C-alpha cells in the first residue's frame, strides 16, 4: 500500500484558511528575527511565495512570547533562561493557533514547543478534553505527560492523563468515568486511544489542539497511521494540528500536510546536517566475539554520567544486561519484552540516576530525554541512518556535549556506516587506540 492511499482529505470548504491567519503566521516568523540570510534554519510560512526563506534568530526570552505568568514561573523553576532556536521560531506562531510542521534534531526542545503552546491556549473545563497528544511508544507518552506536569505546576485546574497499551484498560476507563479525574489533556499511543474512543469512553468533540510527536514514525506504519486517521476523524475540523520529528523525509512531508491546513513549516538544519553539534562520533571495527571485552574496557576507561547501550534484539538486551551486572556494572535493560509496568519502573530508575547504564533496543531510540546521558554505544549497528540519528541523539541533548561509539563487526555494519556518512555528509573516524580526552565530551 502506498503512502498516499487512505489519507485524510478535507473538503474544499474545510481547507479554506483566512488570509489573516496566513499573514499572522508569516508575520510572527518575521517578527521573530526573519532575515534574508543563509543559515541552518528554514521556515516556509503559510502560503510563502518562495519555499526556503531563511530566518536568523535573535536573542529572545520566554517573556517575549506573551505566555501566561503561571507558565513563565514554571519555566523559571525548570532553570530555562533562553528559548532554543526551534522554540524561538515556532512558539510565537503556534500560539496564534496556526498549524505547525517541524523538523529539528534531537535535544532542541521540540516537546516544550507544543507543551507550552497548548497550555497557554487551554481554558480547562471540568470533564472536557481539549488537547490530544499522540506518540508511538509508551515511554515517550509517559515522558510527555511528565513535561505537562512540570510546566502546569502553577495551573492547578489543569488535569493531564496518559493512556497506552500493555496496562489494564479498566484503569483508563475509571479515570474517564469521573468528572473529577477526567483529563483536559490526553497523551497516549494510537492503539489504546482508538480503543477508548470506539468504546465511547473518551470524547474528542471538544479537541482544540491535535499533536503528533515523532510523526514520521507514526504515519510511516500502516496500522498506526490508520489508528491516527480514525482518531483524527473523531475530532472537530476546526482545530490546530502540530507535528514534530527529528527526521522528516521528503516523502513523508506531504502525508503530514494532508492532516493540516496551510501549516508553518520549520526545518531546523536540512536533511544532510542532522548530525548533532557537540557530539563526538566514532566507530570501532572488531569481531562479534570481541564486543563484550571491548565494551567492558570502554566502561572501565571512559568518564560518563550515564550511558545507553543499543542492541538489536530483546534477547541480546537481556544477555548483555546480565553480563554487565555479573561484572558489577549498575545496569538495567529496557525493551519491548519487559512488561509495561516494569518498563516504566526501570525508565524512572534510570532517569532518576539510580542506575547509570541502560541496555536498550530501539524502543528507547526516539524522543526519550534523559539529560544526564552523555555516552551512547551502538553494541549492534542500527538498521539505517535515521535510526542511527535517533539513537546517538540520546547523548548530548539540548546542544550539550556527548560521545557516541558504534561497533562495526560485519560487511552489513560497514555498509550502514557508509550510508550514515553519505546521508549526513560526515566522516566518522575510527576510535583512537589511546582513547579520547574527556573534556571533548563531558560538559
Swiss-Prot record:
The name this protein goes by in its record: ATP-dependent RNA helicase SUB2
E.C. number: 3.6.4.13
GO annotations of cellular component type: spliceosomal complex
Keywords: ATP-binding, Helicase, Hydrolase, mRNA processing, mRNA splicing, mRNA transport, Nucleotide-binding, Nucleus, RNA-binding, Spliceosome, Transport
Record's subcellular location: Nucleus
Phylogenetic classification of the source organism: Eukaryota, Fungi, Dikarya, Ascomycota, Pezizomycotina
Family: Belongs to the DEAD box helicase family. DECD subfamily.
Organism: Coccidioides immitis (strain RS)
Annotated catalysed reactions: ATP + H2O = ADP + phosphate + H(+)
Cited Pfam families: DEAD, Helicase_C
Role description: ATP-binding RNA helicase involved in transcription elongation and required for the export of mRNA out of the nucleus. SUB2 also plays a role in pre-mRNA splicing and spliceosome assembly. May be involved in rDNA and telomeric silencing, and maintenance of genome integrity.
Any one GO molecular function term: ATP binding
Coarse class of the protein's main subcellular location: nucleus
Amino acid at each position: 500500500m502506498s503512502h498516499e492511499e487512505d489519507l485524510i482529505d478535507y473538503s474544499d470548504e474545510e481547507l479554506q484558511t483566512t488570509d489573516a491567519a496566513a499573514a499572522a503566521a508569516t508575520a510572527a516568523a518575521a517578527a521573530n528575527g526573519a532575515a534574508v540570510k543563509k543559515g541552518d534554519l528554514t521556515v516556509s510560512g503559510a502560503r510563502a511565495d518562495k519555499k526556503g526563506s531563511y530566518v536568523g534568530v535573535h536573542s529572545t526570552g520566554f517573556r517575549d512570547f506573551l505566555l501566561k505568568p503561571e507558565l513563565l514561573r514554571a519555566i523559571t523553576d525548570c532553570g530555562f533562561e533562553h528559548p532554543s532556536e526551534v522554540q524561538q521560531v515556532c512558539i510565537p506562531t503556534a500560539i496564534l493557533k496556526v498549524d505547525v510542521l517541524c523538523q529539528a534534531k534531537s535535544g532542541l526542545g521540540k516537546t516544550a514547543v507544543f507543551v507550552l503552546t497548548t497550555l497557554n491556549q487551554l481554558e480547562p473545563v471540568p470533564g472536557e478534553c481539549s488537547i490530544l497528544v499522540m506518540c508511538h511508544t509508551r515511554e515517550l507518552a509517559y515522558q510527555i505527560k511528565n513535561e505537562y506536569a512540570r510546566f502546569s505546576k502553577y495551573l492547578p485546574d489543569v488535569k493531564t492523563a496518559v493512556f497506552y497499551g500493555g496496562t489494564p484498560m479498566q484503569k483508563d476507563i475509571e479515570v474517564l468515568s469521573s468528572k473529577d479525574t477526567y483529563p483536559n489533556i490526553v497523551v497516549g499511543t494510537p492503539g489504546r486511544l482508538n480503543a477508548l474512543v470506539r468504546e465511547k469512553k473518551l470524547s474528542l468533540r471538544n479537541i482544540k489542539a491535535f499533536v503528533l510527536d515523532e510523526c514520521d514514525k507514526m504515519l510511516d506504519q500502516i496500522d498506526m497511521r490508520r489508528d491516527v486517521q480514525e482518531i483524527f476523524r473523531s475530532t472537530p475540523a476546526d482545530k490546530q494540528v502540530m507535528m514534530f520529528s527529528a527526521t522528516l523525509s521528503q516523502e513523508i512531508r506531504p502525508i503530514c500536510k494532508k492532516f493540516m491546513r496551510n501549516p508553518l513549516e520549520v526545518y531546523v538544519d536540512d536533511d544532510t546536517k542532522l548530525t548533532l553539534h557537540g557530539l563526538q562520533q566514532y566507530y570501532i571495527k572488531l569481531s562479534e566475539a570481541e564486543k563484550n571485552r571491548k565494551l567492558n574496557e570502554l566502561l572501565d576507561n571512559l568518564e560518563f554520567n550515564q550511558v545507553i547501550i543499543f542492541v538489536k534484539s530483546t534477547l541480546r538486551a537481556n544477555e548483555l544486561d546480565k553480563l554487565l551486572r555479573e561484572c558489577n556494572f549498575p545496569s538495567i535493560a529496557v525493551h519491548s519484552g519487559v512488561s509495561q509496568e516494569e518498563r516504566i519502573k526501570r525508565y524512572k530508575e534510570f532517569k532518576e540516576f539510580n542506575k547509570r547504564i541502560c541496555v536498550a533496543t530501539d524502543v528507547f531510540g526516539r524522543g526519550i530525554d534523559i539529560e544526564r546521558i552523555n555516552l551512547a554505544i551502538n553494541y549492534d549497528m542500527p538498521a539505517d541512518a535515521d535510526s542511527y540519528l535517533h539513537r546517538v541523539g540520546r547523548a548530548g541533548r539540548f546542544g550539550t556535549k556527548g560521545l557516541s561509539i558504534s561497533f562495526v563487526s560485519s560487511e552489513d555494519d560497514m555498509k550502514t556506516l557508509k550510508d550514515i556518512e553519505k546521508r549526513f555528509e560526515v566522516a566518522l573516524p575510527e576510535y583512537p587506540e589511546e582513547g579520547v580526552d574527556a573534556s571533548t565530551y563531558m560538559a
